[in-house]
Amino acid sequence: MPIWGAISSNDLLNTYYTIEESQQIVEELLDFQMHNDQLEYFDSIEDAKKRFITDLYEILEKKHQKTNTFQIVSPPSAGKNFFIETVLAFYWNTGVIQNFNRYNNFPLMEAVNRRVNYWDEPNFEPDATETLKKLFAGTSLKATVKFQKEANVQKTPVIITANYDKFTKEVWDDRIIKYYWYPCPKLKEYNKRLHPFAWVYLIDKYVTDLLILIKMYNHRVMGNKICNLIKMYKYRVMVINIFSAFICLILIFLTNNYLGPGLYTCKSIDETTLSEAVVIWPSDKVTNHKEVFQADKQARDEFFTSFVHIGNVHSLIGGIGLGTKNLVEEHVLGKPLYGMGKRKSTEKDWAKIKRINRARAARRENQENQPDIREFGHVAGQNINADQEVNLADFPDFLQDFDAEAGPSGTQPVETAQQSPPTMSEDIQPMETVGATDTGGGAQVDPRTGGQAAGGSEMGAGGSANDGREDIFSGAPQPNQHHTLVYGKSYHFTITKWFTEFRHLATTNSGYYAQQRFKHIHGIPWERLLMYVSEGELLRMFRDYTSLKVEEVVCEVYSLGVRLPFVTSATTSSVANANAQYPIDVFHFDEAYETNYGINNVADIINKALGTEWKNATRPTAPVTTAWSEQFPNISASSTSRDINNPVIVDYSLPYFENNVPKDVGIYDYVDIKNGTTAYGKCWEKRFKPTNGLLYAESTLKGNVVTPLAAPTNIMTPIPGLENGYFMSNDQIRERRDLTTSVPPDALTATKLNQSASNNLNAFVDYMGYNYFGEQKAPQSMPKFMIGFVNIRNEDNSLLNAKWDILIKTRIRLTGLQSTREWVARTDRIPPQYFTSQYTQFRYPNINDTPLLRSLGTFKLPTKRPGMDSRIALGELQKQRKMNL
């Protein structure tokens, strides 16, 4: 038995794993690395592994005319060298390619007369491109050897491992087969090398279709002895053919078996009686008998050549079998023993290989350059490149243990109707400079610019504009700064269940309603900004930015298991089995029905998320050190968990004096159900891009008084970016060709001047709005995230109680506009980058109308049904108003 890289035969097991251990480890490694390729290009991981091993095998056995190189690209600790060194050890005669640079005149010196050449972390100068093209294509070339004459490098397979792909141009696609691997944490557990015979195992399993009568006898020493014996004969081919025929006759008469492709039905030969096997090698792409004979001879010679050079007993067995087959067919029968049949072509689709290589490279580049916001921990925000566009839909998912949220069609896509405009940029809309001034018109001029209009294309003598990364000179107007901010939070909650309730509600303004409240379905208030940021982060954003806009949010639900009651004394007739599979589910029937939930329940969840029950509720008037306590104001940490109690309400409008009622809500038409007993880890995910995610913006459309309705300016100001020419004056907004007027929209819900502690804490990710000025935009808003149970009853109709532990993980991406000079944009007007298309979302007929007040009622809670308010009793609404005041 060879010792390969071991110090001695006694040290072999200290250096290499056993063959069985190596087989298991290499399968685990390939399962991990082929998983990503399987998701994109193959039907299963087995197909991906088969393609990988086949590609490597065909390169090593020189099966391709032009493609002669196999490359694995990966970051460190991916296992590429761990795997490739095993393959190279199997072939023994391995050469090393050195880097091509001015300091090395003999890069191919060690690559002459080798079975396979290896190049780790390649680096080369452009002058070596033509040489490498020949080397990678298997074309013969000359190599300079130190202190010797030039040598000839024949077609020799090349194996490359690299951390970065240096061969990205199209010229290499026909010469190199590339695979991209990923860091494998489990490699840290392995302290030995893989046994080289693991490569034989992989070939037998994933490449060869040979009919093996018994297990191949792996012994290189015996193979070398047989090789030397055969070399002694002058006519070794004739001797081998005679010996092959003799072995074949013995096998046929002793076992009474028929050897043929696709017809092998005999029992296995006893391994104790024979140590060798006859193997049938099928020929490919032949059209007549003569080509069959020629293909068999060629394959036979390749087997014997392999045996002579590397002592592979498998090759000897294959050569013997093919020699016997050819002798009988050509000289006895005169025709192939098994018929022609249809042989599968091994011609490769190079166009597809190019596409796969490019897709793998693009995916790897995207993975390296685009961070997934779900992987961030507790961060205070991240200032990314101002012009960088972040698209979460393009990011790879590393947590796919469970399916994403599914609807009736099986998938729940990102809300494409909610696509926001591109990330803020100076190129979207130039700063409006021709507007009203205190003289009634004309360009805005600042003396520090040397007489030029602020924000104009040319700067005056006072200084020159820059991109914000250069020195700031006195008097030079600076461009706005756009920052991308990423925040994230994680929460541990529990969900309980109860029966559904109903009632009739007489409202004061919109008629008569019937309501259902599903107490086993609860809403996650992911529309609230404070589910993503802390109070301090929110205040810092309001302090640091002129205006702020939500670009995208992500909310994930992880299941920690459903806890069922432990029944000890009840009978089976009254209580269901405590080990029952309790279903958990996510609902999205808000697509078809008007839904809402109570603002007090939402406030309770937000308080628990912020920790106000222990930070603020019991804080004394004077600073004092208190004793440790387990009794929290809202929950008892020693006995119960943090419940989400936010049942979803469905509203049905009922006409007066009519008895007909609308259809009952089909909640199970819009549900994705999982087994709560076995579902652990990530269960569902929702992503959303707000239509109107503007949190606030400073504006001079308001006075200096912080009131619910600040006094507008007396200056007529055009709304920038609107083609129809809307104008604002003292108390009116009007269109140039329309006499209809109304109170000017002071952007109350999104104006920094009007921020207060109460409405800051009630900020929403998306403010739905309805256009009143003819814009062709469908009213849309943020969908609800509703999770819960399917109720299970006992035989006596009582409810089988359960408690569901969940983790909620949220991430938010915002863009902030920071004006660098007050006279440029900070207090001049609403920044046009936001309001070119979104400004009409704030045009309500009456600015004093309740929907604009953030902290009142539940009418701002998301619904996909336009024109529907929350139906709260008048007394509850008045009580809520008093609390806010």
Swiss-Prot record:
It is found in: Host nucleus. Signal peptide: none annotated. Pfam families: Parvo_NS1 (PF01057). It catalyses: ATP + H2O = ADP + phosphate + H(+). One of its GO terms (biological process) is DNA replication. Residues 404-477 are annotated as: Disordered. Its EC number is 3.1.21.-, 3.6.4.12. Keywords: ATP-binding, Covalent protein-DNA linkage, DNA replication, DNA-binding, Endonuclease, Helicase, Host nucleus, Hydrolase, Magnesium, Metal-binding, Nuclease, Nucleotide-binding, Transcription, Transcription regulation, Viral DNA replication, Viral genome packaging, Viral release from host cell. Residues 409-423 have a biased composition (Polar residues). The keyword Mitochondrion does not apply. Its cofactor is Mg(2+). GO terms for cellular component: host cell nucleus. The keyword Chloroplast does not apply. The endonuclease active site can probably bind other divalent cations. One of its GO terms (molecular function) is ATP hydrolysis activity. Residues 452-465 have a biased composition (Gly residues). It is an enzyme of class 3 (hydrolase). Belongs to the parvoviruses initiator protein NS1 family. In the N-terminus, the endonuclease region is involved in binding to the origin of replication. In the middle, there are the ATPase and helicase activities. The C-terminus probably contains a transactivation domain. Homooligomer. Multifunctional protein which displays endonuclease and helicase activities required for initiating and directing viral DNA replication. Also plays a role in viral packaging and transactivation of several promoters. Binds site-specifically to 2-3 approximate tandem copies within the origins of replication (Ori), unwinds this hairpin region and nicks one DNA strand thereby initiating the rolling circle replication (RCR). This is Initiator protein NS1. It comes from Bombyx mori densovirus.
